[in-house]
A protein has these predicted regions:
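Mixed-charge, low-complexity intrinsically disordered regions
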Residues: 1-19
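Glycine-rich, positively charged N-terminal anion/phosphate-binding segment
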Residues: 17-33, 48-123
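Short beta-strand segments
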Residues: 101, 126-130, 170
Length: 171
């Protein structure tokens, strides 16, 4: 697959579905390098479904964790303003570096959820490609995405190009 075009170090918004506006803030290669440097050699709390809630993350920060990640957020429901999903986007002021993990199999959904995470104060976005829970599997989310590598590649590229945050992938 050809490399994404770069102009002045900025990522180009390609493969974004029609009707989606681009964001003013783009992720530059320098921003990605700075993000990587900021999490290098840091204690990172992995995203934990039904365990990585805000009180638990605060406890982990008190015990020395510097990078925290939300519980898995179903992108579709967050975009429908489901209060349970929106609560998972909350960040505490003690969280030095905070990421939001999303579950989606659609580029537009992932981009819009990423923008919501950005507006909520996240430092990075994490795409869940490792969850084996039946509920995610039957919806084509989580680990099920690994069954279709070409689709997964399009999804990752599309979300990475469309969100104003660095993107990580949990496998």
């Amino acid at each position: 697959m050809p490399k994404r075009p770069h102009v002045d170090g900025r990522r180009q918004f390609s493969d974004i579905p029609d009707g989606m506006e681009t964001v003013e803030r783009v992720v530059t290669d320098e921003k990605i390098a700075a993000f990587r440097a900021s999490i290098a050699n840091e204690l990172v709390l992995a995203p934990l479904t039904k365990g990585g809630n805000l009180p638990f993350r605060r406890l982990c920060v008190d015990l020395g964790c510097n990078v925290t990640v939300s519980e898995m957020v179903f992108a579709r429901y967050a975009l429908k303003r489901n209060p349970v999903e929106l609560a998972r986007l909350r960040r505490h002021e003690s969280e030095k570096t905070f990421g939001v993990q999303i579950a989606t199999n659609q580029i537009a959904e992932g981009v819009n959820a990423g923008r919501l995470a950005f507006e909520s104060g996240a430092d990075f976005l994490d795409l869940n490609c490792g969850c084996p829970i039946h509920e995610t599997w039957k919806r084509g989310l989580g680990a099920k995405l690994l069954k279709k590598p070409a689709k997964l590649e399009r999804l990752v590229r599309g979300i990475a190009d469309g969100v104003p945050l660095p993107l990580t992938v949990k496998i």
